[in-house]
Amino acid sequence: VIGGDEXDINEHRSLALMYXSWSHRFIXXGXLI
C-alpha cells in the first residue's frame, strides 16, 4: 500500500510540474505577445 501511495504521489507531482510548467510558458508567451 505504501509503495502504491508513493507511486500515486510521484505521478501527481509529475502532472503538477508539467501543468505548472505549461501554464508558466502560456502566461509568459501571452505577456510577450
Swiss-Prot record:
One of its GO terms (cellular component) is extracellular region. It is found in: Secreted. GO terms for biological process: proteolysis. It comes from the Eukaryota. The lineage of its organism: Eukaryota, Metazoa, Chordata, Craniata, Vertebrata. It catalyses: Selective cleavage of Arg-|-Xaa bond in fibrinogen, to form fibrin, and release fibrinopeptide A. The specificity of further degradation of fibrinogen varies with species origin of the enzyme. The keyword Cell membrane does not apply. Its main location: secreted. Keywords: Blood coagulation cascade activating toxin, Hemostasis impairing toxin, Hydrolase, Protease, Secreted, Serine protease, Toxin. GO terms for molecular function: serine-type peptidase activity; toxin activity. It comes from Cerastes cerastes. Belongs to the peptidase S1 family. Snake venom subfamily. Its EC number is 3.4.21.74. Residues 1-33 form the Peptidase S1 domain. Homodimer. This is Thrombin-like enzyme RP34. Expressed by the venom gland. Thrombin-like snake venom serine protease that displays clotting activity on fibrinogen. Shows both arginine-ester hydrolase and amidase activities on synthetic substrates. Also shows proteolytic activity toward casein.
